[in-house]
Amino acid sequence: LASRGALIVVNDLGGAVDGAGSDASAAQKVVDEIRAAGGEAVANHDSVSTPEGGESIIKTAIDAYGRVDIVINNAGILRDKTFHNMTSEFVDPVIDVHLKGAFNVTRPAWIHMREQGYGRVISTSSAAGIFGNFGQANYGAAKMGLVGFTRVLAAEGAKYNIKSNVIAPLALTRMTENLMGAIGDKLDPSLVTPIVAWLAHEDCDVSGEIYSVGGGRVARVFIGETQGFYK
């Protein structure tokens, strides 16, 4: 996005995979890379898991650039455990970051988007949410929640030219680097970014859609209903 002229707020609390701790250098490293390549970016280190954190992220954008046109909900943590052994300490933080985090950031941005009659919201779901994955009842519930979140925003944002879509990416990231093994070499995040750039573009006319993306492949995902029968 920065290479195409977008002015970026890089938010990253810099916590561990399970959400513990923080490290301001995570966001600053990306900002430095963007600036070195000739782009513009500022860092923000707030947690998306609180309303105050979400408001601060959007305020950073308004203070730096005067408006907010694009929100990409991409924060995530993992606390995997089989359902038999899962307790609220594994569920609540995951819901707070993935699902409530998307709400906390998008809600203050939505006010500006409605007023200006334009906005693009891209949320990050997962195959674990859409199709399910062993040991991830918490994560899957949060990620499928983002599908419903996205489709409602698409409906409510239509008359304000706000488009909302969701991606289910497969990529090697700081969160997944210890999970993928050799296949991770073929899953560079740069193979995901083109669809994000497209969904964020002013010419993009789709809304309420789900896209699976990774390794150079993009596929539309949909929820279907059979013809059914009448008794």
Q: What would you call each of these model-derived segments?
A:
Residues I34, T82-F83, F90-I95:
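Substrate-binding pocket helix/loop in short-chain dehydrogenase/reductase
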Residues V166, G184-K231:
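C-terminal helical subdomain
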